[in-house]
Amino acid sequence: MNLTELKQKPIAELLEMSDAMGLENMARSRKQDIIFALLKKHAKSGEEISGDGVLEILQDGFGFLRSADSSYLAGPDDIYVSPSQIRRFNLRTGDTIIGKIRPPKEGERYFALLKVDSINFDRPENAKNKILFENLTPLFPNERMKMEAGNGSTEDLTGRVIDLCAPIGKGQRGLIVAPPKAGKTIMLQNIASNITRNNPECHLIVLLIDERPEEVTEMQRTVRGEVVASTFDEPPTRHVQVAEMVIEKAKRLVEHKKDVVILLDSITRLARAYNTVIPSSGKVLTGGVDAHALEKPKRFFGAARNIEEGGSLTILATALVETGSKMDEVIYEEFKGTGNMELPLDRKIAEKRVFPAININRSGTRREELLTSEDELQRMWILRKILHPMDEISAIEFLIDKLKQTKTNDEFFDSMKRK
């Protein structure tokens, strides 16, 4: 019996299973309580149960395996991990653990971890001699992540425009600057599907902070990756806890030389949550931002890096502008210089219903010569020289019009050469 498989089943199927096993009055229970009751029943019959989750170590020294399906929220189906196991395997918050579990004994409330089978998708003995994330050497991104699918569809236009004006590499720290209703959510969906298609070796996590519940559902259905969310009706402490769990998980995977991509929507809302949660220092910046409030969101964003020893952590975060809030402007200004790739979306272009609404002249990647070939770089510069005299709207319209006539960017460059 596997705990994760049960969590992925719809509630109707779980109720049928509980009826078949003779469990009564389950119809009005929460999903986690139904799973808890089912596993307890299975364990009584002597079956082996396996479970997995991401470790969160509490101040008392013990920890719990939280589930990504419930966005790392504490629940009755969490798995208890004892302090002795944490010391023995040198575990830290964010480690992904798979192992055998046992049902709670008399007076216990949680399932407990019996045996560790794997840590961060690797053998437990390999986890002991890994280097800490803080001690790894950061580099500029030097391995390209292509965004174009090459099928010539209209959905592929976003990826192709990004490839032309702001190429993304493994370990990029990118900021998507977006006014309201400029199509940032659709753009993130496109980027997510292109990453899973072109770079299946990357572990993708989409982190939605303070978003609408219907957008979370849509993202879960369109993205073939892990979607972790804290909707706008949750308290700010919850936003902060979710973000910390995600970044810790990503760091632990990078320590095992994995490539991780986090798409964050949005860093502005995360900074607002931290501003509410941290104790007041008495120093307040314009717009009501506490002087120390942005330290942790900066630490989150600054974790993105390409690692010399192997592995990388890429973070693409959206920053909200033109919302009419002074606080949002201050937060954006603080993050403006920290990224090494910027992709501004333009409200005027979006109002004309031209998508993707990217402002090409202002977008770009630092040290893009490390990601592109000499020949491609020259072509991209020539394209910028052609588009620069135009205003934002006519530049993107001209580019989209020309891109629609070809299937791939290479074909587009060849047609440019002929002209």
From Swiss-Prot:
BP GO terms, sorted: DNA-templated transcription termination
E.C. number(s) listed in UniProt: 3.6.4.-
Chain intervals for the UniProt region annotation (RNA-binding 2): 284-288
Site (RNA-binding 2): K326
One GO CC annotation: cytosol
SMART domains cross-referenced by the UniProt entry: AAA (SM00382), CSP (SM00357), Rho_N (SM00959)
Top-level taxonomic group: Bacteria
Binding site for ATP: G169, K170, G171, Q172, R173, G174, K181, A182, G183, K184, T185, I186, R212
Record region (RNA-binding 1): 61-66, 78-80, 108-110
Residues annotated as domain Rho RNA-BD: 48-123
Keywords: ATP-binding, Helicase, Hydrolase, Nucleotide-binding, RNA-binding, Transcription, Transcription regulation, Transcription termination
A GO molecular function held by the record: ATP-dependent activity, acting on RNA
Its biological purpose: Facilitates transcription termination by a mechanism that involves Rho binding to the nascent RNA, activation of Rho's RNA-dependent ATPase activity, and release of the mRNA from the DNA template.
Subunit structure and binding partners: Homohexamer. The homohexamer assembles into an open ring structure.
Name of the featured protein: Transcription termination factor Rho
Species per Swiss-Prot/TrEMBL record: Pseudomonas aeruginosa (strain ATCC 15692 / DSM 22644 / CIP 104116 / JCM 14847 / LMG 12228 / 1C / PRS 101 / PAO1)
Upper taxonomic lineage: Bacteria, Pseudomonadati, Pseudomonadota, Gammaproteobacteria, Pseudomonadales
